[in-house]
Amino acid sequence: MLMPGLLNDPVLLLGLMAFGALLLALPLAFWNLSGEPRSSTSRVVQLLVVAANLLLTAQLLWRWLDSGHFPISNLYESLCFLAWGCTFTQLFVERSWPSPLVPAATTPMALVCVAFASFALPDTLQNAAPLVPALRSSWLVMHVSVIMMSYAALLVGSLLSAAVLFTQPGQAMELRSSSIGSGSFQKAGLQTDGGTVVLEAAPIALSERLDNLSYRTITVGFLLLTVGIISGAVWANEAWGSWWSWDPKETWALICWLVYAAYLHTRLSRGWQGRRPAWVAVSGLFVISVCYIGVNLLGIGLHSYGWFFDS
């Protein structure tokens, strides 16, 4: 929450500046989506998201130098890192497809993370705190950063899948590209040019592009989540002598892994595309919310950052 001595705390100030940049970017992104997209507006939105990402980068580095450990030890740092991961993933996706739909779909997630961290958390969860002995390990950077980046990629991919559900409402969706390609199975058109037959590639539909980008982003997130779970098991065995203890966070991380494994299975083995796998990905949004925020706020288990049931 805001404090009178805000200017004396650069970490909180940088977080609020990132919030301001995202708050400006969001209405511009929706406005650019509502009418004919303007390249100048798209550029401003992108610059604001870049500014937010750089501000979050500076914030996390400042907290790292100030605390002496990787800035992921409490819910405030975790939320800011997740917002950084979401903005980074968003910018990476926009490089593949500079569409106004991408910032309109994904900017709200980063904004919610920074807003919750800046305005909803008590001071005790915003201030830096020393690490408990079990967390003083080189595995901290490896495990937690990979898990958080997997959440960011899965969230962005799932939001793009949610956008698929709102394209071509009430119409059958014809997707011509494969799940493992990028238009290699598109139907081509034949035209004649002075008696010569010309093979012309069919244009890629909006829903098709969204479907393909969400699939690729979720695939990256799933691989990162797999690496994160494995590294967490190795770390747990070193710290507590047990590979898996069915801690609430571990259980929900496994559920999250199974949901997105089902998403990939339906695409690769069943050939699902469009709205059906999109619904599976959207259900993953709920699972990640419970895994990340829900379990944390209950204050139960080894992975919690919460305060509701803390003594």
UniProtKB/Swiss-Prot annotation:
Main localization of the protein?
membrane
| InterPro entries recorded | Cyt_c_assembly, Cyt_c_biogenesis_CcmC, Cyt_c_biogenesis_CcsA, Cyt_c_biogenesis_CcsA/CcmC
Per UniProt, the keywords (alphabetical) are:
Cytochrome c-type biogenesis, Membrane, Thylakoid, Transmembrane, Transmembrane helix
What does the UniProt entry say about where the protein is found?
A: Cellular thylakoid membrane
Q: Which residues cross the membrane?
A: 11-31, 44-64, 68-88, 101-121, 146-166, 217-237, 251-268, 280-300
Q: Which cysteines bridge via disulfide bonds?
A: none
UniProt GO MF annotations: heme binding; heme transmembrane transporter activity
Q: Name one GO biological process term.
A: cytochrome complex assembly
What span is annotated as the signal peptide, if there is one? none
GO CC, alphabetical:
plasma membrane-derived thylakoid membrane
Name the domain of life this protein comes from: Bacteria
Q: How does it sit in the membrane?
A: Multi-pass membrane protein
* Purpose: Required during biogenesis of c-type cytochromes (cytochrome c6 and cytochrome f) at the step of heme attachment.
The annotated subunit structure for this chain is: May interact with ccs1.
Q: Which HAMAP family match?
A: CytC_CcsA
> Its family?
Belongs to the CcmF/CycK/Ccl1/NrfE/CcsA family.
Name listed for the protein in its UniProt record? Cytochrome c biogenesis protein CcsA
List the source organism: Synechococcus sp. (strain RCC307)
Gene name in the database record = ccsA
